[in-house]
Amino acid sequence: HETGYNCSFAGSFECDNSDLNSLWKKSQRTLYITMRDNYMDCPDRERAQWIGDVSNEMVEVFYSLSPSANLLTRKCAREFADWQRSDSVMYAPVPEGNWKKELPQQTMAFMGLGNWNYYMGTGDAATIKYVFPAAKRYVHKWKIEDNGLVEYRPGAWDWGDWGDNADMQALCQAWYSTTLKNYAKQADLIGETAEAKWATAAAKKLDETFRNKFWTGSAYRHDTYKGLTDDRTQSVAVIS
């Protein structure tokens, strides 16, 4: 029996390709059944609120479900901020009873790009203002070196998402740049002009150094990385 969050199917997609039409319907219902009291990886194996999963699913909601579904994202954003550790680390899944491990790149994905995507889809500035103090503490936990690059932090789980050949050093720089730029937008939105200016300047300097040190002429790579070129790094670097 299919169960999901208290919302309705609202988005639609149709084309002359039956396979794509079927994929849309399956994707829409897959999203729905991964939403109950929180977003989840999947209802069969993993029902915890991993923030990396939320970062993807919350955007899908805008195109496929009724606006009431955005309340689940609002709940997640506030919980994520409320469970911040005393050392400024933000971690997931939360709420939790026996887990406090940080996956830095998942956290950056949500606190920067995720929060701003939520605002762009809802106009809910109150939630941005609510989570901003936690975001500020987390952003400033990262140490920026004199050349503008951010000092690499593996966290408790050094994971670059699924797949092999993860250029973690390069990926970290790209994610922190993305986070800074979206954090600056949040700061500007709620009147934190000094933070917005700082984050914008820091992102600009990071990007300049990143291009000079990591671009090989054909791809972004850290000089100590020996594996195949990481497509994740290229993607995040481009969107940042």
Where are these regions (language model features)?
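Substrate-binding groove/exosite segments of carbohydrate-active enzymes
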Residues: 1-143, 154, 158
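Catalytic cores of carbohydrate-active enzymes
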Residues: 28-30, 43-56, 60-62, 71, ...
